[in-house]
Amino acid sequence: SGTMFGYEGLGCIYWHMVAKLLLAVQERVFEAADLAAPELPALQHFYRRVRDGLGYRKSVADYGAFPADPYSHTAGEGGAQQPGMTGQVKEEILTRWGELGLRVRDGQVHFQPVLLDRAELPADGALRFTWAGVPFAYRRGTVTTLRVQRDGVWHDCPQRCFAPQGVAAVEADIAP
C-alpha cells in the first residue's frame, strides 16, 4: 500500500488491524471452547502469538512510543503515528474482557477463562478488577468455580453464568 498515507505505507505496523485479528482469533477460541473442539489448544497458542505482537507486550523501540498509549500505526521509518482513541482501543478492551473470561450472551454473563494467563493470578491474594461497576476477585484454586453476591448473600453459579442485575460482587477460583 505504498500509495497510502506515510504512516500507513510499506513497512508499517497497523496496530488496529492486528487488534482486529486478535479479536477474530478470540472469537474462534470461544467457539472451539463451546464445542470442546480438539483445535482449542492450537487456537489458544495462536491467540497468544497475536497478543504478544501488540501494545504492552512490545518494547518502546518496537512500538515507537510508550507501549500502552493508543496509537494506530508505527511507520516503517520509526515512531508511532496517529495518536488518540483509535479503534484499536475498542478491540483491546473487548479482548481483555474475553481474556478475563467474561462474555455476555442472552442477557447473562458467562464465565469461561480459557484465555486467562494463570501467571496473572497472584500466589497469595487475588487478581482484582471492576467490570460494569462490579468488583471481581479471581484466585488460584483446584477447581474453577464462580460465586456472585446479591443482597449480602453469596450464591454459587454451577453453570458459570449469572444475570447481572443486582450483583454486588463476583469471586472466582480458577484451576490450573
Residue map of PLM features:
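Acidic, mature catalytic/reactive cores of soluble proteins
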Residues: 1-176
